[in-house]
Amino acid sequence: MAHNYRGRIAPTPTGYLHLGHARTFWFAMERARSEEGILIYREEDLDYNRCRKAYSQAAIEDLSWFGCVWQKGPDKSEMKQSYRQSERMPLFLKAWKDLKEQGLIYPCEKSRKDIRKASENIQNIDLEPIYPEAWRPSHDVADKIDSPEGYN
């Protein structure tokens, strides 16, 4: 019986991998295999200042040497989509523009702890956690965010 399981490994090429990476990726590979699914290698290379091509190549070589196997990734010749985040920037920008047009982009001044606590207070367990409406700014504040880099 085939499953639709899709696991992923997502190293950031800002340095060489260590045994902790290998262990984590091995478990991800075994999980995908046990679920009769696939493992996807997706590179998190959006830190333009620290990511290096040499680290990217070394990660693929080292994980392959270690015995990790993935079915989709930047090193697969049948690649029909990009598995490097930096190559997906046009998709991210389109999604950002779509959310902006819907009025769903706004600054957040709450801490992760505040948001986690609000999510824990949801009464209906069937609902996804939703950012509390009372915390959302007025539309004039949201309209000032003109680019993905506009608010940090």
Predicted feature residues:
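N-terminal Rossmann-like or analogous alpha/beta NTP/dinucleotide-binding catalytic cores
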Residues: A2-Q123
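Active-site cores that bind ATP or allylic diphosphates and position pyrophosphate for catalysis
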Residues: P107-N152
